[in-house]
Structure formats: structure tokens, C-alpha cells
């Protein structure tokens, strides 16, 4: 099982004082050194944390794949084609939200998403759709020719309900049946990571805010190593 580390909130801290530190590339590189299999960043339209220069610098210096989260807009598409990350993850975006509140509606936004997915894939960039854990959303992700789906697991991480966990497990199994790799992300901490890691067809977890918070107490290396240890042990014992 793989671990993706999202470093958006390293940039949030930097931007609060308009300083050059903390350095997003240095923190990302430390995360990789300590077990991160790929690095994720969300380049939002309002540039509230990650900025264009961060994305280009990460692509240049990282020894692991870069996963670029972005809205399905013309501006972001052109940036992605210039950066050429290994993967782009298409997400919904609202200016007033604190963080991404839900998955992208692959059915309702089909006509908007289709040309963006096609253009990215023709440019040699793999495409992931960040979706709710629902079979219909998986179906439309497949119709859009997405390479992967990432399940929005925020509802489970907040509620810890068995019903939400079953939704994730069912959507992951269905994604596998449809031939699409399945990741999970949003709101994950050590406890929820341990549980989600037992779901056979979830192949990677994306974790950001929690790991950055843990890093303030224990350091980046310790936080990332602990998370990687937990998910690998849970997967092995599942």
C-alpha cells in the first residue's frame, strides 16, 4: 500500500507571513526520504496555499511522482500540461470553502470533465477523479476514461460509522471490478488510516493536514514514518 503526502499546509504556514520558509520542496523531500511514495499538492484557483512556482519546483526536484490536484478549468489544464506531473487529480472547488467539501460529480459534470480528461491523457498525464464512494460515480469515472479514482472518505473520518466504512469498501471493490485503481483521501489520521488500510482494493492513502500537524510535535520524518508503518502493518494483517 502506498502513502501520498499532501504538503499544501506547509505553503499555508509560509504564506501567513509571506516568507520563503518553510520550504515546500524541502519538506516534501523529507517526507519522501521517510516513506512517502508520492507527493500531492492542490493548486487552487485562488492560490491560497500552493503557488505555481511550488508545483514546477516540486516536479523538478522530487524523486517520486507528483500528484497535482486541480479544478477542471482551462487555466489549470494549461498549467498541468506545462508541469507534466505523473498524475492530475480532478477535484471540485468553491472559493468560499475551507477545504474540499465533496467529491467531483462525474455524472453531473461529465461534459465539462470529458475534454479535460481527454486533453490530459493525450499529453501523457494520468488522470484520477476525486469522487464520492458511490458506484454511479465510479461508472462515470470509467466512462470518462479516468485511470484511477480517489474516494472522498471525509464522512467516514468524521463519523467513524460502519455504514460509511462499508460504502468505501464497496466502492473500492467495484472500482477494482471496473479495472480502475482506487485511492482514498480527506480527513485521514492515524486511526482512520489503520481502518481504511484494511480495505483490500484501496491501494493508496493521501494524507495532508493531519501529518503536517503531527510534524509540528514530532517532526516530518517521525510523522510520515509512523503513518507508513501503520498502513503497511494493517494491510499485512488484513
Swiss-Prot record:
Site (Transition state stabilizer) location in chain? 150
Q: Does the keyword NAD apply?
A: no
GO CC aspect terms: cytosol
Could you list this entry's UniProt keywords, alphabetically sorted: Cytoplasm, Pyridoxine biosynthesis, Transferase
Name of this chain's protein: Pyridoxine 5'-phosphate synthase
The UniProt family comment states:
Belongs to the PNP synthase family.
Residue positions binding 3-amino-2-oxopropyl phosphate: 6, 17, 187, 208-209
Q: Which residues form the active site?
A: 42 (proton acceptor), 69 (proton acceptor), 186 (proton donor)
Where does the chain bind 1-deoxy-D-xylulose 5-phosphate? Answer: 8-9, 44, 49, 99
In alphabetical order, the GO MF annotations are: pyridoxine 5'-phosphate synthase activity
Oligomer and partners: Homooctamer; tetramer of dimers.
- Cleaved signal peptide residues: none
Amino acid at each position: 500500500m502506498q502513502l501520498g503526502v499532501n504538503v499544501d499546509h506547509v505553503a499555508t504556514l509560509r504564506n501567513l507571513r509571506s516568507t520563503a520558509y518553510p520550504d515546500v520542496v524541502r519538506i516534501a523531500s523529507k517526507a519522501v526520504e521517510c516513506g512517502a511514495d508520492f507527493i500531492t499538492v492542490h493548486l487552487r484557483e485562488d492560490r491560497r496555499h500552493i503557488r505555481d512556482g511550488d508545483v514546477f519546483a516540486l516536479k523538478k526536484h522530487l524523486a517520486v511522482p507528483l500528484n497535482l490536484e486541480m479544478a477542471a478549468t482551462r487555466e489549470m489544464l494549461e498549467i498541468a500540461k506545462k508541469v507534466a506531473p505523473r498524475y492530475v487529480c480532478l477535484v471540485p472547488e468553491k472559493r468560499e470553502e475551507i477545504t474540499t467539501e465533496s467529491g467531483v460529480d462525474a455524472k453531473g459534470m461529465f461534459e465539462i470533465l470529458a475534454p479535460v480528461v481527454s486533453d490530459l491523457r493525450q499529453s501523457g498525464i494520468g488522470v484520477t477523479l476525486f469522487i464520492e464512494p458511490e458506484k454511479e460515480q465510479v461508472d462515470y469515472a470509467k466512462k470518462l476514461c479516468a485511470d484511477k479514482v480517489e474516494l472522498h472518505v471525509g464522512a467516514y473520518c468524521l463519523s467513524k460509522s460502519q455504514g460509511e466504512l462499508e460504502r468505501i469498501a464497496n466502492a473500492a471493490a467495484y472500482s477494482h471490478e471496473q479495472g480502475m485503481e482506487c485511492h482514498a483521501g480527506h480527513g485521514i489520521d492515524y486511526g482512520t488510516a489503520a481502518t481504511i488500510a484494511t480495505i483490500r482494493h484501496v491501494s493508496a492513502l493521501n494524507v495532508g493536514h493531519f501529518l503536517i500537524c503531527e510534524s509540528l510535535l514530532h517532526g516530518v520524518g517521525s510523522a510520515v514514518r509512523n503513518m507508513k508503518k501503520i498502513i503497511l502493518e494493517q494491510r499485512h494483517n488484513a
